[in-house]
A protein has these predicted regions:
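General structural feature for long, well-ordered alpha-helical segments within catalytic domains
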Residues: 5, 44-45
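Terminal beta-strand-rich extracellular "head" domains
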Residues: 31, 37, 42, 55-61, ...
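Sequence-level motif detector for i,i+2 pairs with an aromatic at +2
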Residues: 1, 22-25, 59, 174
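Solvent-exposed, flexible loop/coil residues
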Residues: 13, 28, 40, 47, ...
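Extended, low-complexity regulatory regions
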Residues: 49-53
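Glycine-rich, low-complexity segments
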Residues: 3-36
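Local beta-strand/beta-hairpin segments that build beta-sheet-rich folds
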Residues: 17, 24-25, 45-48, 93-97, ...
């Protein structure tokens, strides 16, 4: 006679029988290694920087985490920056962006201008948020950016002067966008 002995069986929903929510059901991610630059004063997609996830349950949440290897706007003063928002299936209406407040735009992150040398760019910029989509249909989350002024470009995974030397500030970086389904 065969026996199967286990401490617990975790169902597809990510939560053992008798337990409450919080288990990770699935993880979907994208890794962006190419360099991106824009001077757009309207929101534009960051190319090849989106994830699609299909929740198993309407009660589950989606945790979005984004980390830019390096990103920002290089200027001599700190009065020009950039705005970042996350779209879900093409809509700004999700729990990842700010609530509507008069005529103010809805962002999840506001980047400042960095007054470093032209070849320097800060790194480790990121954000996260928990969305409550209440669906089992596919969800596509993508990141968009907008420049405050077209004179001051937003750069991602590269220094502003796009140097290719061997100095640390000229090195290539990687950015990640991660979606995790969390059991409700």
């Amino acid at each position: 006679m065969s026996q199967l002995k286990v401490n617990s069986i975790i169902p597809r929903s990510g939560v053992p029988v008798g337990a409450s929510g919080g288990g990770i059901v699935q993880v979907v991610s994208t890794r962006k290694t190419d360099r991106f630059t824009t001077t757009s004063t309207s929101f534009v997609d960051i190319t090849n920087f989106q994830v699609t996830i299909t929740p198993f349950s309407t009660s589950n949440k989606i945790l979005i985490m984004c980390c830019f290897g390096q990103a920002g706007t290089r200027i001599a003063t700190l009065d020009h920056g950039n705005a970042i928002r996350v779209l879900k299936n093409g809509s700004i209406d999700n729990n990842l962006n700010a609530d509507a407040d008069g005529t103010r735009q809805r962002h999840c992150y506001k980047g400042v201008g960095w007054s470093y040398n032209a070849d320097h760019m800060p790194g480790g910029v990121g954000f996260c948020g928990l969305d409550d989509p209440s669906t089992t249909s596919a969800l596509t989350y993508k990141v968009q950016v907008q420049c405050q002024s077209s004179s001051y470009a937003f750069h991602m995974n590269r220094p502003p002067d796009n140097g290719t030397g061997t100095n640390i500030y000229e090195n290539a970086t990687v950015s990640h966008l991660i979606a995790m389904e969390v059991a409700g």
